From Swiss-Prot:
<comment type="similarity">
    <text>Belongs to the class I-like SAM-binding methyltransferase superfamily. Cation-independent O-methyltransferase family. COMT subfamily.</text>
</comment>
<keyword id="KW-0489">Methyltransferase</keyword>
<dbReference type="GO" id="GO:0046983">
    <property type="term" value="F:protein dimerization activity"/>
</dbReference>
<dbReference type="InterPro" id="IPR029063">
    <property type="entry name" value="SAM-dependent_MTases_sf"/>
</dbReference>
<protein>
    <recommendedName>
        <fullName>Chavicol O-methyltransferase</fullName>
        <ecNumber>2.1.1.146</ecNumber>
    </recommendedName>
</protein>
<dbReference type="GO" id="GO:0009699">
    <property type="term" value="P:phenylpropanoid biosynthetic process"/>
</dbReference>
<dbReference type="Pfam" id="PF00891">
    <property type="entry name" value="Methyltransf_2"/>
</dbReference>
<feature type="binding site">
    <location>
        <position position="259"/>
    </location>
    <ligand>
        <name>S-adenosyl-L-methionine</name>
    </ligand>
</feature>
<dbReference type="Pfam" id="PF08100">
    <property type="entry name" value="Dimerisation"/>
</dbReference>
<dbReference type="InterPro" id="IPR012967">
    <property type="entry name" value="Plant_O-MeTrfase_dimerisation"/>
</dbReference>
<comment type="pathway">
    <text>Aromatic compound metabolism; phenylpropanoid biosynthesis.</text>
</comment>
<dbReference type="GO" id="GO:0032259">
    <property type="term" value="P:methylation"/>
</dbReference>
<feature type="binding site">
    <location>
        <position position="245"/>
    </location>
    <ligand>
        <name>S-adenosyl-L-methionine</name>
    </ligand>
</feature>
<keyword id="KW-0808">Transferase</keyword>
<dbReference type="InterPro" id="IPR036390">
    <property type="entry name" value="WH_DNA-bd_sf"/>
</dbReference>
<comment type="function">
    <text>Phenylpropene O-methyltransferase that catalyzes the methylation of the para-4-hydroxyl of chavicol to methylchavicol. Can also convert eugenol to methyleugenol but with less affinity.</text>
</comment>
<dbReference type="InterPro" id="IPR001077">
    <property type="entry name" value="O_MeTrfase_dom"/>
</dbReference>
Amino acid sequence: MALQNMDISLSTEQLLQAQAHVWNHMYAFANSMSLKCAIQLGIPDILHKHDHPMTLSQLLKAIPINKEKSQSFQRLMRALVNSNFFIEENSNNQEVCYWLTPASRLLLKGAPLTVAPLVQVVLDPTFTNPWHYMSEWFKHENHATQFEAANGCTFWEKLANKPSMGRFFDEAMSCDSRLVAHVLTKDYKHVIDGIRTLVDVGGGNGTMAKAIVEAVPTMKCTVLDLPHVVAGLESTDKLSYIGGDMFQSIPSADAILLKFIIHDWDDEEGLKILKRCKDAVGIGGKVIIIDVVVGVNHDVDEVLEDQLHFDMAMMSYFNAKERTMNEWEKLISAAGFTSYKLTPAFGVRSLIEAYP
């Protein structure tokens, strides 16, 4: 068909805006990979160690890169500034200086609230390759998940069969737990005050549980996770580890904590977990759920988009999902809980307290 005969009903301005929108999403991965590169090169750490803004020439001396690629590095910094990971300032000699933003402070390696390990896990080829199988997954029944199509095994089998990847993932989850625990014990401590015993289901190496017992010294915590996850971890009088299966049995306690657990499963499996939790706490107890509630805090910058990204990731990895409040209500009610309380406490995520 001749171009002049195509009726697209768009003005020139609309046409070019539409093209820019497509291109923006076509190359959105460039932001992700530039972020990954910044962490791998240690740019945030170098700036932080310097303790004040650095010029491009200072950065180039401090960062172990091929000096013939200095101009390319400047372009990387320009992209990262545009993504709000760094800011530009003018120095006395008019050379541009770079400094940290709140977001890049979360990328400092070894910092208490760093999210750098999580970024590196999510952007590792093991976890990015499944996205290339999305259309095939929709069309065929060969694989239960996109992850399985890409890797030849399930997500959990991959972590169990490759210990280095398992440790990589555990550290990513630990860094997330430290940030969540910081907010929970600082701003929502009343949620855990008065609890004598708590089981952190899927609590990994106990990062979250350790922070909780430090904040509430009268509490005793138990971490329940798969045997290979808790193997070798030492219990104390306040914190113990149990290797087990949450689908089979959950130890009794005043409260059960589910942080980023239910979203890994479809409704059928999620319902089984919640029923086990309800039985474990009994009347007078509660289940504390920290997870995404799609649409909550949607008016906060980037939150809804993050929630939808997480939803697509859960579909890719597990054929699971993030849930709206209506979907959460149905699941909580079906599990036999009589009431719940929702608190939009964690930005992209929310706090749900479910009562038998």
